[in-house]
Design a protein with these regions (language model features):
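Flexible, compositionally biased loop and terminal segments
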Residues: 1-237
Length: 237
């Protein structure tokens, strides 16, 4: 078991769940089988983060660009959200606060209702914050924040010259939460894919050559240990 270092505000991790389709293709299975296995891994890794004492974790589940995939695949993914990410996770018996990041207005009303209820029911929890990014994109999030501040400026609530980084951060979906200390991407890919672009300014990047459906608790231990040995300078020396 990994032992996260002591950080101000606790350890915060971003995870890009990547490789479901390739995992299925390598086994001659439909892509939906990879997403199902990936959802099972999500549950286990989320539980493990809680057991490790991680303060907050951000899972990239569905991007704004993922709508471009075949309708059958998108439909299957949406069903998995309800079955695994929401209904199938033991939230009630864990001290976990749930937050959903992204534009949920494009999602099925039933799914939206489930998401809203989960956030409300867990709002008073004091343990780890579990963030699930659904219909999320880093650029749209920044545009949304800028529009909110522009509207306030137009209404005379703030002056444009007073807008600063903290005000932008407070207008993000992640308002009030710590930026990720490191972002983990399985599958061997080396890009952020529009994930937490504002919040990742000084996040360490940890890439691993394992597809998400094969990802284990031991792999997370390895990622945390690698991060523990990084020297973060935040632009200094």
């Amino acid at each position: 078991m990994a032992h996260p270092k002591e950080f101000a505000g606790g350890l915060s991790i971003g995870i890009i769940m990547d490789g479901n389709g390739r995992w299925a293709k390598n086994r001659g299975l439909p892509r939906t089988a990879g997403h199902k296995k990936g959802a099972e891994v999500f549950k286990d890794i989320a539980n493990y983060c809680d057991e490790l004492g991680v303060a907050s974790v951000y899972f990239y589940a569905f991007s704004t660009e993922n709508w471009k995939r075949p309708l059958e695949e998108v439909g299957a993914i949406m069903k998995l959200f309800a079955q695994y990410l929401i209904e199938g996770f033991d939230y009630k018996n864990r001290n976990i606060r749930i937050k959903f990041l992204g534009d949920r207005t494009a999602l099925d009303p039933k799914l939206q209702k489930m998401m809203n209820e989960l956030e409300g029911d867990s709002a008073c929890k004091t343990g780890m914050t579990l963030n699930i990014a659904i219909n999320y994109g880093g650029r749209p999030e920044i545009v949304r924040a800028a529009q909110q501040l522009a509207a306030k400026a137009a209404a005379g609530e703030i002056r444009p010259e007073d807008i600063n980084e903290q005000m932008m951060s407070d207008a993000m979906y992640t308002a009030g939460q710590k930026d990720p200390d490191f972002i983990l991407r399985p599958s061997g890919e080396k890009r952020l894919s529009n994930f937490m672009l504002w919040q990742a300014a000084y996040s360490e990047l940890v890439e691993m050559d394992v597809l998400w459906p094969d990802f284990t608790r031991a792999d997370l231990d390895t990622a945390i240990e690698e991060f523990n040995h990084r020297s973060r300078r935040f632009g200094g020396i």
